[in-house]
Curated annotation (Swiss-Prot):
It comes from Homo sapiens. Its EC number is 2.3.2.27. It catalyses: S-ubiquitinyl-[E2 ubiquitin-conjugating enzyme]-L-cysteine + [acceptor protein]-L-lysine = [E2 ubiquitin-conjugating enzyme]-L-cysteine + N(6)-ubiquitinyl-[acceptor protein]-L-lysine. A zinc finger (TRAF-type) spans 150-202, 203-259. Pathway: Protein modification; protein ubiquitination. Changing D57K: Loss of interaction with UBE2N. This is TNF receptor-associated factor 6. Sumoylated on Lys-124, Lys-142 and Lys-453 with SUMO1. Polyubiquitinated on Lys-124 by TRAF3IP2; after cell stimulation with IL17A. Polyubiquitinated on Lys-124; after cell stimulation with IL1B or TGFB. This ligand-induced cell stimulation leads to dimerization/oligomerization of TRAF6 molecules, followed by auto-ubiquitination which involves UBE2N and UBE2V1 and leads to TRAF6 activation. This 'Lys-63' site-specific poly-ubiquitination appears to be associated with the activation of signaling molecules. Endogenous autoubiquitination occurs only for the cytoplasmic form.
Length: 522
């Protein structure tokens, strides 16, 4: 740890009985691939799962001998077990039979309990060594039963669902299907380059705004989005109404015949226009006149109300501006009072100040993420009158040279109320302590003592609110040591600063501390 003047930075087969056949029909089938792995047998499955599956439903070559056939499910024995009466069953089948049909053997009705069953490992090894055919259609491979599962995992004839249309296809065909045959494969429009599923392309082509279409009237080829404008304005053969349709002419003609129609029907169009004008100039009856007067009165009333509301709005706006200025003045007064209260509180410290740093876990996380963490304490006085000081805590980054993962702790002088009445530069002793917050009778605080060096700028009278130059320890305490005891409690770190403007070496020795040698100021 170094003390530095810091500037800003720092069995046998038997025929099945009627009872056995009935049990076979009642045993539930499971449509799930049987686990037959090469080195990992079905014995690795959980007991609850094993009780729900039957024998191996595969084709054996040569055909399965009857001695390896379960009398209940009539398939090859899976997890073969033997009864005291010498019969073999699938483990799951016989357990289900005992629980559903009673404690008896399905073949000879002898009394049979679950704890009387014992594994037939010989039969199990024999069955797993039998040759079987791959169940996938088209695959001609044969292998031992124990290798069937591994083969099926890589068999090119195994079925798998297309990720786009969800239909099943054999593995060797799935890529061709996805690229060329799948109705949900992605294609793009030749006209607008939009992407869509192949099965949706036909509908898109019928509505694509950039597709070429032929005008049904003049056979002009245009893109679809231009066609409505073409019909309304440009198509020479599109049917349109007469210009005088609003006045009573109901004729329709091609656009290129409109001029001839207007020329040939000028007189009739004029008569229609005259009748329309005449109907508009007819004097309305008294009922309409009274209604118009009522509307005028209503408008006049609304205008008066609008003027009054406008005046009210202006008055309210002026009041609001006055209130806003008053609130701003109150806020300034509150800030001034808060500053005065803080100043008074700082003066009550009498040189001993305990700084509570909350949310310290957040600061440690920022340090681990290599984000700079620099925290300043509120100001405090060494007495009344006295010097005004503050502390600065800096969590050094993991990449910092010579001080990585250390807590740096410094003291800064501040402009205070009594600066003009105090001797400068500051002289005295500063004791910095990180408090142990454990409940132990004897607490092990981490404490360092330093003497002020009057020749350093850090102890000169500050010319700005806070002296940018500080004095303290770059390597005050390692973060690993911080975690070894209860220095952090309720996510809060307590830092104590005791300042004495008189240096009493005798009192320091009596308390068991020796002043540390200080490094040259930087």
């Amino acid at each position: 740890m170094s003390l530095l003047n810091c500037e800003n930075s720092c069995g046998s087969s038997q025929s099945e009985s009627d009872c056995c056949v009935a049990m076979a029909s009642s045993c539930s089938a499971v449509t799930k691939d049987d686990s037959v792995g090469g080195t990992a047998s079905t014995g690795n499955l959980s007991s609850s799962f094993m009780e729900e599956i039957q024998g191996y439903d595969v084709e054996f070559d040569p055909p399965l001998e009857s001695k390896y056939e379960c009398p209940i499910c009539l398939m090859a024995l899976r997890e073969a077990v033997q009864t005291p009466c010498g019969h073999r069953f699938c483990k799951a089948c016989i357990i289900k039979s005992i629980r559903d049909a009673g404690h008896k053997c399905p073949v000879d009705n002898e009394i049979l309990l679950e704890n009387q069953l014992f594994p037939d490992n010989f039969a199990k090894r024999e069955i797993l060594s039998l040759m079987v055919k791959c169940p996938n259609e088209g695959c001609l491979h044969k292998m031992e039963l124990r290798h069937l599962e591994d083969h099926q995992a890589h068999c090119e004839f195994a079925l798998m669902d297309c990720p786009q249309c969800q239909r099943p296809f054999q593995k060797f065909h799935i890529n061709i299907h996805i690229l060329k045959d799948c109705p949900r494969r992605q294609v793009s429009c030749d006209n607008c380059a939009a992407s869509m599923a192949f099965e949706d392309k036909e509908i898109h082509d019928q509505n694509c705004p950039l597709a070429n279409v032929i005008c049904e009237y003049c056979n002009t080829i245009l893109i679809r989005e231009q066609m409505p404008n073409h019909y309304d304005l440009d198509c020479p053969t599109a049917p349109i109404p007469c210009t005088f349709s609003t006045f009573g002419c109901h004729e329709k003609m091609q656009r290129n015949h409109l001029a001839r129609h207007l020329q040939e029907n000028t007189q009739s169009h004029m008569r229609m226009l005259a009748q329309a004008v005449h109907s508009l100039s007819v004097i309305p009856d008294s009922g309409y006149i009274s209604e118009v007067r009522n509307f005028q009165e209503t408008i006049h009333q609304l205008e008066g109300r609008l003027v009054r509301q406008d005046h009210q709005i202006r008055e309210l706006t002026a009041k609001m501006e006055t209130q806003s200025m008053y609130v701003s003045e109150l806020k300034r007064t509150i800030r001034t009072l808060e500053d005065k209260v803080a100043e008074i509180e700082a003066q009550q410290c009498n040189g001993i100040y305990i700084w509570k740093i909350g949310n310290f876990g957040m600061h440690l996380k920022c340090q681990e993420e290599e984000k700079p963490v620099v925290i300043h304490s509120p100001g405090f006085y060494t007495g009344k009158p006295g010097y005004k000081l503050c502390m600065r805590l800096h969590l050094q980054l993991p990449t910092a040279q010579r001080c990585a993962n250390y807590i740096s702790l410094f003291v800064h002088t501040m402009q205070g109320e009594y600066d003009s009445h105090l001797p400068w530069p500051f002289q005295g002793t500063i004791r910095l302590t990180i408090l142990d917050q454990s409940e132990a009778p004897v607490r092990q605080n981490h404490e360092e003592i330093m003497d002020a060096k009057p020749e350093l700028l850090a102890f000169q009278r500050p010319t700005i609110p806070r002296n940018p130059k500080g004095f303290g320890y770059v390597t005050f305490m390692h973060l690993e040591a911080l975690r070894q005891r209860t220095f952090i409690k309720d996510d809060t770190l307590l830092v104590r600063c005791e300042v004495s403007t008189r240096f009493d070496m005798g009192s320091l020795r009596r308390e068991g501390f020796q002043p540390r040698s200080t490094d040259a100021g930087v």
